[in-house]
Amino acid sequence: MNKLTYIQEIVLKCINKYYEENGEAPTLSELCEMAGINTKSTIHWHLRNLQKKGYIRVIPKLKRGIRFINNN
């Protein structure tokens, strides 16, 4: 897997924390708030890059459609 940027690490940790606390993925709005990012387009950009790097899968048009990819 490719190395993560500092912000990508924060976004990934926020997703993981939300999963642990709630048993489901955060919405984009919740993720923006948790990561301290102002716009959904910026979150989309980071999610797209995390997906390209093989850390997550984003299911289009699904409200809580962020899934971790198991790469053991």
Segments from the language model and where they lie:
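Short helix-capping/hinge SLiMs at alpha-helix to coil transitions
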Residues: 17-23
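Helix-turn-helix DNA-binding helix
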Residues: 42-43
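Alpha-helical DNA-recognition elements
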Residues: 17, 48-49
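Pre-recognition alpha-helix immediately N-terminal to the DNA-recognition helix
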Residues: 10-17
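A short, conserved structural fragment
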Residues: 51-59
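Short, Lys/Arg-enriched anionic-surface-contact patches
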Residues: 1-10
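Short, cationic-aromatic polyanion-contact patches
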Residues: 5, 22, 61-72
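A short alpha-helical element within helix-turn-helix/winged-helix DNA-binding domains
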Residues: 25-37
